[in-house]
Amino acid sequence: MRTSQYLLSTLKETPADAVVISHQLLLRAGMIRRLASGLYTWLPMGLRVLRKVETVVREEMNAAGALEVLMPAVQPAELWQESGRWEQYGPELLRLKDRHEREFCVGPTHEEVITDLARNELNSYKQLPINFYQIQTKFRDEIRPRFGLMRGREFIMKDAYSFHLNQESLQATYDGMYQAYSKIFTRLGLDFRPVQADNGSIGGSGSHEFHVLANSGEDDIVFSDSSDYAANIEKAEAVPRESARGAASEDMRLVDTPDTKTIAALVDGFGLPIEKTIKTLVVHGAEEGTLVALIVRGDHELNEIKAANQPLVASPLVFASEAEIRAAIGAGPGSLGPVNLPIACIVDRSVALMSDFAAGANIEDKHYFGVNWERDLPLPEVADLRNVVEGDPSPDGKGTLVIKRGIEVGHIFQLGTKYSEAMKLSVLSEQGKPVNLIMGCYGIGVSRVVAAAIEQNHDERGILWPSALAPFQIALVPLKYETESVRQATDRLYAELTAAGFEVLLDDRDKKTSPGVKFADMELLGIPHRIVVSDRGLNEGVLEYKGRRDSESQNLPIGELMSFITEKLSR
């Protein structure tokens, strides 16, 4: 492809509204343009990258036995009403009416549509298991779209849905999708981690997220430094570093603590080690009208997902108001603790191993110091309630935990029968009895992968595409293309490279565009290999080569270039 016949829309300046590096570089490289809040047009250069992601995804899904379909983006309200999600889904669901006043939505996801398809097309166990997928545009009406493709309102997603008679069949397909996703992100050249995840409101028995590691990631992911254990921060099990509770060495005493409403004030005002303090948080109980106290160590953070999964606690998690707390306990936040606590209490595992600790006395402006379990009060229910911290023991007993930032680009779920029961999807079993099908769902944010790849692969000059994603493999840059010898040599080399199957962008812009601008544009675009043709080089029988990740260029004999490039691109 010649730049004279292509849309090369690079920008020198970074648009003011672009915050994250992927958004900045996608705009500067002329790969996308903003149409409206959270809506982007893909320009030819960016579309080449997007199509490469789609190709790898499609190849691996096909290899895993999934069948491609294409479902409508606009969906009838009746299906969502049938599943119960029409009322449950928030304002992110874009609803509309047609000229006949029938209600529809623009699909943020396709569980209802695929379940409707399955109940109309599947009628026998002999058709199972089966796995459908599509690559389709989705829409979620985010209140504050931001970060370009990372959190837009319209996005491109690969979503797959599988149907099974039993859990064993689902597990086999789920494992196959796990392997397919691992192959996809490996082929795309991304540094990623699959992590255990919480199913949340989706339900089901298994879930994994796939995260691209990047400092700009929105999510904390946790993995062992010595094993394959990995989980997101919501799911990671927090194992105490202490193996046993220390012996009591202080008597419990009541201490006046005026104006001490925070852990920081307690530590600073009384010289206490933070690991000898606790935080008491009060939430609504599962039984209507009840409250439950959740206690974590002062230097730890409550994991709200783990808390909401406790049988005594209401889900979703609702924190009690100060008025509710005072009415139930007689003291306000900052003075709460487990001693003489009149409501149910759950303590974190690390709290259960504490000795000689400080806790609110449930009396305004007073704390107990030197508190010890079993001696001063019975040990209440113990559960894993906190977020892990770096250096915690790995739950599998191998090594310690490392925490890094990640960008979620894929998620696989074992859905169970949530949709098949709600929408009456069943087939006849081998015994001739109707059986509700068990479902799995598997998503990849195709357009988000493009942004995540840039977040992980860039430098001060622009994008550093992994080779599988680069819009072109080779940038061919002639100096003084108007010179006959340079033009002939460049055109000949361009013909040879394209005939060999390489994707080449020939920068044939005229002499008004300086070599420096050409080089800067090719680096901004992230094209992995650059070849420079010049009069001087031709006179010396060489071409200049520079890899995008190289610090220095090198001269290659003209006759060796094809074998050199072929070897480079075969790695």
From Swiss-Prot:
EC number(s): the record gives 6.1.1.15
Signal peptide span: none
Known catalysed reaction(s)?
A: tRNA(Pro) + L-proline + ATP = L-prolyl-tRNA(Pro) + AMP + diphosphate
For the keyword Cytoplasm, the answer is yes
Q: Which GO terms describe its biological process?
A: prolyl-tRNA aminoacylation
HAMAP family in the record: Pro_tRNA_synth_type1
Protein known as: Proline--tRNA ligase
UniProt organism field? Pseudomonas paraeruginosa (strain DSM 24068 / PA7) (Pseudomonas aeruginosa (strain PA7))
| Organism lineage string | Bacteria, Pseudomonadati, Pseudomonadota, Gammaproteobacteria, Pseudomonadales
Task: Report the gene name.
Answer: proS
